[in-house]
Curated annotation (Swiss-Prot):
Binds 1 divalent metal cation per subunit. Its EC number is 3.1.3.5, 3.1.3.6, 3.6.1.11. Belongs to the SurE nucleotidase family. It comes from Escherichia coli O17:K52:H18 (strain UMN026 / ExPEC). InterPro entries: SurE, SurE-like_Pase/nucleotidase, SurE-like_sf. GO terms for cellular component: cytoplasm. This is 5'/3'-nucleotidase SurE.
Length: 253
């Protein structure tokens, strides 16, 4: 199995290095990751400037100023030959649950892999300690995929409780929960008296009930949420069409 491995925490982050070491025991792994932390970069792609890469002695490749999406795009289309069989993103330092997937560079890297035609996993740890647990879970899933491919055409967003492996209760297939809207902005002043702003933390849990990714992780289970790229709200199409007809928009300008 040939694996393109990326992340959004940066090429030297403990999550990606722990996972790379574990994956290399049974797979051909090429790390292509940002040279620095790009958390929250979502699906951003660098279009107005060039990208420079640096290859380390162990073969890992850092993309200078690159986003997670840049890294996967370059990895698939230029840097990994032959091309990968699958794209894996992670292990992220912290969860990507509920609405987090909108902003997550970890999920975005997997999404880019799927967009380019490859199976893809995004892996996150609900903390900053037991990366070995998340690596073991990921390796188990990848070995299973190698034996029997999962042909859903979906991204698997995997969130692992920050627990020792022997305390993980199992795996649940889940849906995304939701958070309350975030509203924290932290102002500061620089030495010249100019105001700076820091984006605050994400909102608290809103829908974290049974069946959600939040609930699974809170209860000690690995959460696997299938995600797809099509953002169309199919159930709303008729509602929007009826509204347009009722208000007359489009019949005259």
């Amino acid at each position: 199995m040939r694996i393109l491995l990326s992340n959004d925490d940066g090429v030297h982050a403990p999550g990606i290095q722990t996972l790379a070491k574990a994956l290399r025991e049974f797979a051909d792994v090429q790390v292509v990751a940002p040279d620095r932390n790009r958390s929250g970069a979502s699906n951003s792609l660098t279009l107005e400037s060039s990208l420079r890469t640096f290859t380390f002695e162990n073969g890992d490749i850092a993309v200078q100023m690159g986003t997670p999406t840049d890294c996967v795009y370059l990895g698939v289309n230029a840097l990994m030959r032959p091309r990968p069989d699958i794209v894996v993103s992670g292990i992220n330092a912290g969860p990507n649950l509920g609405d987090d997937v909108i902003y997550s560079g970890t999920v975005a890297a997997a999404m880019e892999g799927r967009h380019l035609g490859f199976p893809a996993l995004a892996v996150s740890l609900d903390g900053h300690k037991h990366y070995d647990t998340a690596a073991a879970v990921t390796c188990s899933i990848l070995r299973a995929l190698c034996k029997e491919p999962l042909r859903t055409g979906r991204i698997l967003n995997i969130n692992v409780p920050d627990l020792p492996l022997d305390q993980i209760k199992g795996i649940r297939v889940t849906r995304c929960g939701t958070r309350h809207p975030a509203d924290k902005v932290i102002p500061q002043q620089d030495p010249r008296g100019n105001t700076l702003y820091w984006i605050g933390p994400p909102g608290g849990k809103c829908d974290a009930g049974p069946g959600t990714d939040f609930a699974a992780v809170d209860e000690g289970y690995v959460s696997i949420t299938p995600l797809h790229v099509d953002l169309t709200a199919h159930s709303a199409q008729d509602v929007v069409s009826d509204w347009l007809n009722s208000v007359g928009v489009g019949t005259q300008w």
